[in-house]
């Protein structure tokens, strides 16, 4: 009894260290390097192996052994059953669907959410209303069809970069996309128009933004999402100051946001943009959660 407290404390400490190590290894090593299906299969195999001693002890009960065998066989067959992903990337379950109503239409679905629609035969076709609104904001800021230097926070299917390349010949676009699996899908399944000057960098957009040269672009488009949320580190005043630094005088920042209800997040982000840009405008359709916010030092 005199050592009970010490023993319990040691066991608790060992358990805590194990829990922390397991969480770190799973979150930063396993999930980022090994497909989830492989992780689940590996865990299943380990559980089956751990159960073998108990199965051996229960060998006098054929019914129990048969049940265990059926369950184990069924579990091992699961990874080969049809799933919901074409590609399991480090960040997403990615699915590319063909549009039965448009021959060149492709829908990029990430984790069950529609992220990008691309018509590989017609880069000027913008299927989603929020993308059309962002394009309208760009055209309002830059009349005509003059070439632009643009930077994109987030890539997805590269819908707007290919639209700019088609509607404003000579436009140069740089894209920061964090998921190499999505970039691979773009390269293999969603080819860019011939002659499109689009450079895609596999990197966190916040880090990529910091690498952009001062006064180097006319347009910055924020289109990065984790699910339905904009990554928080792209919404701060510090990040927006970096956007302003990269923009040439009179340049424009257009960001896509999703919010509902009282639009507390959109209101907060508008206030944040107002700390950096002299002129800020918010656009959106009633009854939807999609909003576009544009900021610039130029009132146009």
Q: Which residues are covered by each model-predicted region?
A:
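Basic, ligand-binding patches in group-transfer machinery
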Residues: 54-112
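Class I S-adenosyl-L-methionine
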Residues: 264, 270-300
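The AdoMet/dcAdoMet-binding core of the Class I SAM-like
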Residues: 125, 132-254, 261-264, 276
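Structural signal for membrane-spanning alpha-helices in multi-pass inner-membrane proteins
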Residues: 26, 51-55
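Residue-level recognition of pore/gate-forming positions within transmembrane alpha-helices
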Residues: 19, 44-48
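Loop-to-transmembrane helix entry/capping segments in MFS-fold secondary transporters
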Residues: 2-11
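A membrane-interface helix-boundary motif in multi-pass transporters
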Residues: 30-45
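Glycine/proline-centered helix-kink
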Residues: 14, 19-27
């Amino acid at each position: 009894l005199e050592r009970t407290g010490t023993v319990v404390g040691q066991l608790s400490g060992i358990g805590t260290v194990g829990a922390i190590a397991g969480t770190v290894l799973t979150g930063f090593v396993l999930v980022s390097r090994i497909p989830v299906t492989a992780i689940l299969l590996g865990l299943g195999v380990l559980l089956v192996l751990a159960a073998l001693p108990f199965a051996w002890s229960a060998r006098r009960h054929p019914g129990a052994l048969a049940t265990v065998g059926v369950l184990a066989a069924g579990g091992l067959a699961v990874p080969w059953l049809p799933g919901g992903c074409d590609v399991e990337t480090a960040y997403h379950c990615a699915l590319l669907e063909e549009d039965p109503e448009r021959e060149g239409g492709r829908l990029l679905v990430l984790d069950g959410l529609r992220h990008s629609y691309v018509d590989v035969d017609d880069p000027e076709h913008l299927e989603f209303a929020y993308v059309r609104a962002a394009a309208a904001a760009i055209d309002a800021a830059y009349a005509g069809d003059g070439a632009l230097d643009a930077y994109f926070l987030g890539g997805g299917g590269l819908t707007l970069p290919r639209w700019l390349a088609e509607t404003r010949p000579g436009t140069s676009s740089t894209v920061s996309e964090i998921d190499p699996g999505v970039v691979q899908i773009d390269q293999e399944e969603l080819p860019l128009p011939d002659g499109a000057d689009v450079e895609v960098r596999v990197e966190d957009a916040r880090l990529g933004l910091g690498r952009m040269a001062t006064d180097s672009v006319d347009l910055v488009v924020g289109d990065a999402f984790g699910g339905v949320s904009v990554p928080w580190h792209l919404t701060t005043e510090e990040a927006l100051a970096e956007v302003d630094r990269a923009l040439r005088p009179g340049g424009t920042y257009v960001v896509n946001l999703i919010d509902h209800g009282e639009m507390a997040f959109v209101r907060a982000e508008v206030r944040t943009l107002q700390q950096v840009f002299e002129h800020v405008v918010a656009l959106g359709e009633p009854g939807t959660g999609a909003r576009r916010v544009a900021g610039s030092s130029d009132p146009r």
